[in-house]
């Protein structure tokens, strides 16, 4: 029993370290992509005539699909040189990460009490982290 508990704790620790490593890698990837976007903005703008549907909503979490559709449009209309190739590679990796995270949304059935606990946390996030529009 003691050995089982020890192995469980080791496994949980390993999972925590792995999750932190992925988050840290993603943070670096996003930071690098922001730097690249800033550096190559003029190249991406081109002649300035490309029109890309852009969400008006300030809660970016709600507009992920639209943002990535815009990225695809930009990618298809931008000359593919080494400078922008890395940007679109990074954006593709970020999308893959988000898609993996979205798969966690389809959870198991919980009792009402557990669902209400989750709902309270969810509403707390909306209340504190989302910009409310009127």
UniProtKB/Swiss-Prot annotation:
Transmembrane segments: none annotated. It comes from the Eukaryota. Residues 1-21 form the signal peptide. Homodimeric cytokine expressed predominantly by T-lymphocytes and NK cells that plays an important role in the survival, differentiation, and chemotaxis of eosinophils. Also acts on activated and resting B-cells to induce immunoglobulin production, growth, and differentiation. Mechanistically, exerts its biological effects through a receptor composed of IL5RA subunit and the cytokine receptor common subunit beta/CSF2RB. Homodimer; disulfide-linked. Interacts with IL5RA. Interacts with CSF2RB. Belongs to the IL-5 family. This is Interleukin-5. It comes from Bos taurus.
